[in-house]
């Protein structure tokens, strides 16, 4: 299955972010201003 690219929406599938040996992207959620529901995007994991 295709993975979700960095900065793309992963709200509906939070374990879909792309990863490789060099990096691991994680789905990070936030509430945009004025939004009633959260928005999640794949971001680079800061731990590596």
UniProtKB/Swiss-Prot annotation:
Family to which the UniProt record says this protein belongs: Belongs to the neurotoxin 19 (CSTX) family. 12 subfamily.
Protein name per Swiss-Prot or TrEMBL: Toxin CSTX-14
Entry text on domains: The presence of a 'disulfide through disulfide knot' structurally defines this protein as a knottin.
Database matches in InterPro entries: Spider_toxin_CSTX_Knottin_CS
Post-translational modification: Contains 4 disulfide bonds.
Cysteines engaged in disulfide bonds, as pairs: 3-18, 10-27, 17-42, 29-40
Compartments reported by the entry: Secreted
One GO cellular component term noted in the UniProt record for this chain: extracellular region
Keywords: Disulfide bond, Knottin, Secreted, Toxin
Organism: Cupiennius salei (American wandering spider)
Organ and tissue specificity: Expressed by the venom gland.
MF-aspect GO terms: toxin activity
KW Transmembrane helix (keyword) present: no
The protein's assembly and partners: Heterodimer of A and B chains; disulfide-linked.
């Amino acid at each position: 299955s295709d993975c979700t690219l960095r900065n793309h929406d992963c709200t509906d599938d939070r374990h879909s972010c792309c990863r490789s040996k060099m990096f691991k992207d994680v789905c990070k959620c936030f509430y945009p201003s004025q939004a009633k529901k959260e928005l999640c995007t794949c971001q680079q994991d800061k731990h590596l």
